[in-house]
């Protein structure tokens, strides 16, 4: 690949070059798709691409190639980077996580950043019969639908409220807090009210 402009090659150009190298049907995936969609804040050192299972692609420096039987036909507007759907990205990343808190962080970040909603996420999870953390992800989707936005909230719901039979708290409820005598009320957001 050759750049047709002067100066440093920016991240967007690197991603397009990797996609062109991989050929038709290749999409950004895993950490790289998460980066493009805003699920993670920092770019990964490697560019992750997914191609259909059964296809061969010689390794290249800085590129990690994944193969998938789950790769769907994707259509993106001209000029937009082809990548896995956010739900597929989350499930692909969940496969690589060693702990539930990491998986929980992915799912709650996706809902908290308004990158997905419950129906499409449930649908994609249902298609993946051998998904690692499947039961836990299903539980996380339900918790996110109820307003859970963090690992801490999920742990509190599961390990404290439900485990001890406590009444459920209300999530993400605005309340008014006075800072002192004569001070005006300040709107805040709290997990419990």
Residue ranges and their predicted role:
Residues 56-58, 168-193:
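Active-site metal-binding core of divalent-cation-utilizing nuclease and nuclease-like domains
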Residues 132-144:
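A short, surface-exposed helix-loop junction/capping segment
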């Amino acid at each position: 690949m050759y750049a047709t402009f002067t100066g440093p090659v920016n991240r967007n150009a690197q991603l397009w070059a990797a996609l062109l190298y991989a050929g038709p049907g290749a999409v950004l995936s895993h950490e790289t798709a998460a980066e493009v969609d805003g699920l993670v804040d920092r770019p990964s050192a490697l560019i992750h691409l997914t191609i259909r299972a059964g296809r061969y692609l010689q390794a290249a420096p800085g590129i990690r190639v994944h193969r998938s039987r789950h790769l769907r036909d994707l259509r993106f507007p001209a000029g937009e980077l082809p990548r896995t759907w956010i739900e597929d990205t989350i499930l692909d990343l969940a496969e690589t996580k060693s702990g539930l808190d990491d998986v929980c962080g992915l799912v709650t970040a996706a809902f908290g950043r308004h990158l997905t909603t419950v129906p499409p996420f449930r649908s994609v999870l249902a298609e993946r019969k051998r998904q690692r953390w499947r039961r836990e992800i299903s539980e996380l989707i339900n918790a996110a639908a109820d307003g859970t936005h963090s690992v801490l909230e999920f742990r509190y719901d599961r390990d404290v409220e439900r485990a001890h039979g406590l009444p459920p708290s209300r999530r993400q409820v605005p309340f008014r807090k006075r800072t002192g005598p004569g001070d005006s009320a300040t709107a805040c957001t709290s997990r419990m009210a």
